[in-house]
Amino acid sequence: CGSVLKYIAVSEAMQGEGGAASIVSELVRHAYTCGRRKLFLFTKPQNEYLFRSLGFFRLAATDGAIYMENSRSGLKNYLDSLEKGRGVQGAIVANCNPFTLGHKYLMETAAAQVDSLHVFILSENSAENAEFSAEARFELVKKGTKHIKNLLLHRSGDYIISHSTFPTYFIKDKADAGRINADLDLTLFGSAIAPALGITTVSYTHLR
């Protein structure tokens, strides 16, 4: 029972009869029985009004997709929980599956160029990250970078979108999926996370 609602569709013959509302309500009810209170969804921009009427709020939107959450304060609470840096600040978003000398070198090099370096480790436990859990990857990076005094380590939470989280069922041209995913992720990071922390330099890596 995950936290992302997806594969929601209503046949053309049934549209306009409240089918989407019934489906979403049932999915939310099921998620709640599994202990999931924070829920997210990806959809086409033209569906925003529909999902807003069902209690979801925009996190980020591009011309190809929109990312929504069933809370007005979820993103703010996440941003408030992040340790703040000082001066010129940079950021790295990494998978680290597992943490390698390549990751270490990248972080050391980036940290030498800024006053504070924010490193976000992807929090998801997916098939792609089956070898090392999110917590194991976080701890490996924590131990491997403790000598970098100006490095601030964060869990990505639900607000940095990886390609394994991003669904593509609503995208007609699957070749566009990677671009739309990246655009949405960068929009959310650039419009909310970076300004909240004062980040001006970003590196995004999925080195394994």
Predicted regions and their residues:
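A short, internal acetyl-CoA/4′-phosphopantetheine-binding micro-motif in the GNAT/acyltransferase core
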Residues: 8-16
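Conserved acetyl-CoA-binding loop-helix of GNAT-fold acetyltransferases
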Residues: 16-29, 104-106
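Conserved active-site alpha-helix within GNAT-family acetyltransferase domains
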Residues: 44-61
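C-terminal "cap" of GNAT-fold acetyltransferases
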Residues: 64-84
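Histidine-anchored nucleotide/phosphate-binding helix
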Residues: 101-115
